[in-house]
Swiss-Prot record:
NCBIfam families: PRK00031.2-1. Keywords: Chaperone, Periplasm, Protein transport, Signal, Transport. Coiled coil: none annotated. Pfam families: LolA (PF03548). GO terms for biological process: lipoprotein transport. The keyword Membrane does not apply. SUPFAM superfamilies: Prokaryotic lipoproteins and lipoprotein localization factors. It is found in: Periplasm. This is Outer-membrane lipoprotein carrier protein. Residues 1-19 form the signal peptide. It comes from Helicobacter pylori (strain HPAG1). The keyword Secreted does not apply. One of its GO terms (cellular component) is periplasmic space. Monomer.
Length: 184
């Protein structure tokens, strides 16, 4: 009986000690775990022989919606959900709709990230390694190599964690009836 009481006392002590430190997750891991929506301005740099730089706004919402609005140097809108990707290029009067074969939407990437010793977060999906860096408790930089082995770095600014975002913005609605819709 005494052995049982000693074990019980140890278990109670451990539960009290754990209650004082309920979270073993870092601030960044907490953000990733509870992230339901994200909004930010972005700068995307494609490092190749001649670097390309794009600017725009990202809005994303769980479980797997994202809208990338490229503003410079060319206008482009990319709508993503769990089934397809729509790339709308207003200058070409064209929208291309492609089935999403691999789960590489924004939230799938974020949910699979694991903290590294250097403080960054990494995951590999379909032979592509993604690396996320936080700054001031918010996602700051996302890096990966594209299919041509070019390094892509997306830097976020004016980031908002869990803003209210209407579902309707993730649905592509042609703004011009004269656009070509290409299904791949």
């Amino acid at each position: 009986m005494r052995a049982f009481l000693k074990i019980l006392m140890v278990l109670i002590f451990m539960s009290v000690a754990y209650a004082k430190n309920p979270s073993t997750l870092s601030k960044e891991e907490e953000v990733l775990q509870h992230l339901q929506s994200f909004s930010a301005h972005f700068k995307q740099v494609l490092k190749s022989e001649k670097p390309l730089v794009y600017y725009g706004v990202l809005k994303a919402k769980a479980p797997n919606w994202a809208l990338w609005v490229y503003e410079k140097p060319l206008k482009k809108e990319i709508y993503m959900n769990d089934k397809e990707v729509v790339i709308y290029e207003p200058n070409l009067f064209q929208a291309t709709i492609t089935p999403l074969k691999d789960k590489t939407d924004f939230f799938t990437i974020l949910k699979r990230l694991k903290k590294q010793d250097d403080g960054s977060f990494k995951t590999t999906i379909n032979k592509t390694t993604y690396r996320l860096i936080f700054k001031d408790g918010k996602p700051f930089s996302l890096e990966f190599k594209d299919e041509m082995n070019n390094l892509v770095t997306i830097t976020f600014s004016q980031a908002e964690i869990n803003p209210t975002i209407a579902d309707e913005i993730f649905v592509f609605k042609p703004k011009d009836e004269n656009i070509d819709i290409v299904r791949q």
